[in-house]
Amino acid sequence: MAAKPFFRRRKVCPFSGDNAPKIDYKDTRLLQRYISERGKIVPSRITAVSAKKQRELARAIKRARFLALLPYAVK
């Protein structure tokens, strides 16, 4: 009997849906979850964020960095 192939369950974008959080550069607690411990933006294949929302997220993180709300790099 052949083994059943393993299918990885597709993750759902955390920013889509009715009561999903809005991406805002002032919300540093939300943005902090999408930054690695070194200060880099985590890719969407890991966080399961859609392409459109990943672009919004990156823009918000860069804006927050420019305004010194988030660090550019962590030592």
UniProtKB/Swiss-Prot annotation:
Alphabetical list of InterPro entries matching this protein: Ribosomal_bS18, Ribosomal_bS18_CS, Ribosomal_bS18_sf
Give the top-rank taxon of the lineage listed in the UniProt record for this protein. Answer: Bacteria
Give start-end of the signal peptide. none
Q: Does the keyword Calcium apply?
A: no
* GO MF term list: small ribosomal subunit rRNA binding; structural constituent of ribosome
Say if the entry is tagged with keyword Nucleus.
no
Q: Name one GO biological process term.
A: translation
User: Mind telling me which GO cellular component terms the entry cites?
Assistant: cytosolic small ribosomal subunit
**Which UniProt keywords are given for this protein, alphabetically ordered?**
Ribonucleoprotein, Ribosomal protein, RNA-binding, rRNA-binding
Q: Which PROSITE patterns match?
A: RIBOSOMAL_S18
Instruction: State the family it belongs to.
Output: Belongs to the bacterial ribosomal protein bS18 family.
Q: How does it assemble?
A: Part of the 30S ribosomal subunit. Forms a tight heterodimer with protein bS6.
PANTHER family with a match to the protein in the record: 30S RIBOSOMAL PROTEIN S18, SMALL RIBOSOMAL SUBUNIT PROTEIN BS18M
* Function of the protein: Binds as a heterodimer with protein bS6 to the central domain of the 16S rRNA, where it helps stabilize the platform of the 30S subunit.
Q: What's the protein here called? A: Small ribosomal subunit protein bS18
What species is this protein from? Answer: Dinoroseobacter shibae (strain DSM 16493 / NCIMB 14021 / DFL 12)
